[in-house]
Amino acid sequence: MLTLADGRKDGKEFISMAPGYFPEIAPELWNDWKWQLKNRVTTLAQLEQHLVLSEEERAGVLLSGDKLALAITPHFFNLIERDNPDCPIRRQVIPRIEETWASPYDMADPCGEDSHMPVPGLVHRYPDRVLFLVTDRCASYCRYCTRSRVVSGVGEQELHTEFEAAFRYLEEHTEVRDVLLSGGDAL
């Protein structure tokens, strides 16, 4: 259940406290994005404090940490169904063992971005538009992330955007009319 935050007059701001994994948190803290980042769920112990994990989830948490970090904001965690391992939101952010399985068809760069990166952090695949990777950190890490190889600060590769070089590139390439900023998805 979503409830209006106490003291709000416009009726537009709300807090989501259901199912209530963090009932003791005051609305002013709950609505503070800095508090949300500081209090992310990042460990197996934190998950098990609130959820009964399936064997696939527990193994996934234990074995996937070197590929993509575990991080879930309290707000997003509150949307997870406690007793349903098939809850879509739960599947989005809690690792499963299948995530660690390797296939001979796996690709190091599944989006093919590296070959279209004139400077680190800027993908120029189409004539008049670029993708500017501005950060490699997100509030919560989605398990299906197409950039999981370069986000969260773990794994073999990291994103090292060269901002000044990217700005120079954009100044020199006047055909670019559309710059898509990516990375660091919202809470």
Regions found by a protein language model. Give the residues of each.
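Short pre-active-site segment immediately N-terminal to redox-active cysteine/selenocysteine motifs
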Residues: 137-141
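Conserved Radical SAM active-site core
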Residues: 94, 106-133, 143-187
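Flexible, acidic/Gly-rich N-terminal and inter-domain linker regions that tether
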Residues: 1-124
